[in-house]
Amino acid sequence: MAAEEPQQQKQEPLGSDSEGVNCLAYDEAIMAQQDRIQQEIAVQNPLVSERLELSVLYKEYAEDDNIYQQKIKDLHKKYSYIRKTRPDGNCFYRAFGFSHLEALLDDSKELQRFKAVSAKSKEDLVSQGFTEFTIEDFHNTFMDLIEQVEKQTSVADLLASFNDQSTSDYLVVYLRLLTSGYLQRESKFFEHFIEGGRTVKEFCQQEVEPMCKESDHIHIIALAQALSVSIQVEYMDRGEGGTTNPHIFPEGSEPKVYLLYRPGHYDILYK
């Protein structure tokens, strides 16, 4: 009796439904892994930390990492404290928001100017074509935080507000909208700095308005100009030289907000 020929497994043609299912499962696995990473980051890092001695930075790098150890030493000549933010892609906006509102607790004149500009900002965005219904809740949260400062809240209570996920994220969304609005209003100027053949509007839709998109020079310039708040960023990376590189946005202005930038991340600095 002749041996039975082994049955050949029927192969699915390329581009079949099974391939699509495999791709979907792969995508879902990646998303699940990313969610786990984000959850781990969230557990380990508050949205905005307590104020810490700047010396905590030394422990984040190996003792023989001479480049960073030297740059931290240089930074220590100019600043005494740091307040860390969660590395979630929204750190620039959160750091800016907390730093400036905290400073306004001791600057009533700037508080009134900032409140007036912020109150009018929704009207400016609507006049540009942003939908009032869409942005209203975010603007209300922004104004609520400013009014909390106006009532002389404590730093601890302001910090609690910034560590409330929904409040903090609504603030970030609104600051992103303000950044987008300014870039689009001044599109003739900013179009020269955008790569990839994109329009300013496309850049804003892809790189500014979505949550968790990291920020660069162009975002900082736009937000500083939109709210007339000067920002000084100390850049610390592996570049040569034992000092951090300070940049003031806009150039020549008197800084109100001080931030530390390490590749992909912003924290708050204090003199």
Swiss-Prot record:
Modified residues (Phosphotyrosine): Y26
Residue numbers of Phosphoserine PTMs: S16
Effect of mutating D88E: Abolishes hydrolase activity in vitro. Abolishes ability to inhibit RNF168
Site annotation Interacts with free ubiquitin: residues: I221, Y235, D237, Y261, Y266
Impact reported for C91A: Prevents RNF128 autoubiquitination, and stabilizes RNF128 in vivo. Abolishes both ubiquitin-binding and adduct formation with ubiquitin-vinylsulfone. Does not affect ability to deubiquitinate RPTOR
PROSITE patterns in the cross-refs: OTU
Activity regulation summary: By free ubiquitin: binding of free ubiquitin triggers conformational changes in the OTU domain and formation of a ubiquitin-binding helix in the N-terminus, promoting binding of the conjugated donor ubiquitin in UBE2N/UBC13 to OTUB1.
Misc remark: In the structure described by PubMed:18954305, the His-265 active site of the catalytic triad is located too far to interact directly with the active site Cys-91. A possible explanation is that OTUB1 is in inactive conformation in absence of ubiquitin and a conformation change may move His-265 in the proximity of Cys-91 in presence of ubiquitin substrate.
Identification of the protein by name: Ubiquitin thioesterase OTUB1
Organism: Homo sapiens
Gene expressing this chain: OTUB1
